[in-house]
Amino acid sequence: MPDEPRGELVIQTIAMPMDTNPNGDIFGGWVTSQMDLGSGILAAKTAKSRVVTVAMEGMSFLQPVRVGDTVRCYARIDRIGRTSMTIPVEVWVTRYMTGEELRVTHGVFTFVAVDENGRPVPVKRDGK
């Protein structure tokens, strides 16, 4: 496991009580949503267009996220195809009260650049 986050900080928030599952930990769907939002920001910035999520792969939940944890999503571009981008995402937390930093989740998201009608378009590279 890496000792520090890889990629660009794309989201930072605090895990709140309303986002818990029946066991009192933060619901995995909420964490996945943060990952999707953060990687979507990076994808749109890279493509310079609207993007849509087409796949999530290799999701691993390594540690629970707890209420009060500061949650940070880091993303990086792994691959750019003609219309798609593959973006690995890592979620790190700073534990509430102790300050311990841990990688808690990781996965890979794939986005496709689309036009205003939702049709795939080439990813614009260097403003082209």
Which residues make up each language-model segment?
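Hot-dog-fold acyl-thioester-processing enzymes
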Residues: 2-55, 112-128
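Short non-domain terminal segments
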Residues: 25, 59, 107-109
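Short, charge-patterned binding micro-sites
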Residues: 56-64
